[in-house]
């Protein structure tokens, strides 16, 4: 299954959560979800009871759409998380957080993960001094992520820096916003990752 490429604000309204897909509008308080916090369509404001399977599927969709992964990528990460010792759901979220496009987003070099993914694809990002153009590349603790020299005047990146200065950084990255580089200092604990996803339901879905 390919990545979702439809209207992202309709998707957020359908799932009922801010997925961080419209960065600038969200930061400006203009997101459609804030204005119309109900599902799109003629019957969007009606309350409907969702089945257990529906809830499980919804949580998987939230995580997939939020981090911008395909079904194949997401399932592979779940299988890897399931093989590791510890809480499978928490490990899954930690693996998603280690994606290069997500780390670029967390460092404030992009207003959305989709923009960060595009920057990586276009070769704007270096990892330990070497260009990496694979958004799913797994960043390890201690690695340096920077915007390459030729891209430091990119208007989208500079605009992202300006906007994300208002929101602050997460605890597990150290960023120099003047020199446009950051260190992924450690893998965050699950409780530090503020995303509206109940990964327990994802584990239940894949465990069937």
Swiss-Prot record:
Pfam family, one: Ribosomal_S4
Top-level lineage group: Bacteria
Keyword rRNA-binding: yes
Annotated S4 RNA-binding domain residues: 98-161
Keywords: Ribonucleoprotein, Ribosomal protein, RNA-binding, rRNA-binding
Its job: One of the primary rRNA binding proteins, it binds directly to 16S rRNA where it nucleates assembly of the body of the 30S subunit. With S5 and S12 plays an important role in translational accuracy.
Family: Belongs to the universal ribosomal protein uS4 family.
Name of the protein: Small ribosomal subunit protein uS4
Organism from which the protein derives: Sulfurovum sp. (strain NBC37-1)
Lineage of the species this protein comes from: Bacteria, Pseudomonadati, Campylobacterota, Epsilonproteobacteria, Campylobacterales
Record gene name: rpsD
């Amino acid at each position: 299954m390919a990545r979702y490429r439809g209207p992202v604000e309709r998707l957020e309204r359908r799932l009922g959560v801010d997925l961080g897909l419209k960065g600038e509008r969200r930061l400006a308080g203009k997101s459609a979800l804030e204005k119309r916090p109900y599902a799109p369509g003629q019957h969007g404001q009606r309350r409907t009871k969702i089945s257990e399977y529906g809830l499980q599927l919804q949580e998987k969709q939230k995580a997939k759409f939020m981090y911008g992964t395909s079904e194949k990528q997401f399932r592979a990460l779940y299988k890897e998380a399931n093989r590791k010792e510890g809480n499978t759901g928490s490990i899954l979220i930690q693996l998603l957080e280690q994606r290069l496009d997500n780390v670029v987003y967390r460092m404030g070099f992009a207003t959305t993960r989709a923009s960060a993914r595009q920057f990586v694809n276009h070769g704007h990002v270096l990892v330990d001094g070497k260009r990496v153009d694979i958004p799913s590349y797994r960043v390890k603790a201690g690695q340096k992520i920077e915007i390459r020299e030729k891209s430091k005047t990119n208007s989208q990146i500079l605009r992202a820096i300006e906007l994300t200065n208002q929101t602050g950084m997460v605890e597990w990255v150290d960023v120099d916003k003047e020199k446009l580089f950051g260190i992924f200092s450690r893998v965050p604990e699950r409780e530090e990752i503020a995303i509206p996803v109940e990964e327990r339901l994802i584990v239940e879905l894949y465990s069937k």
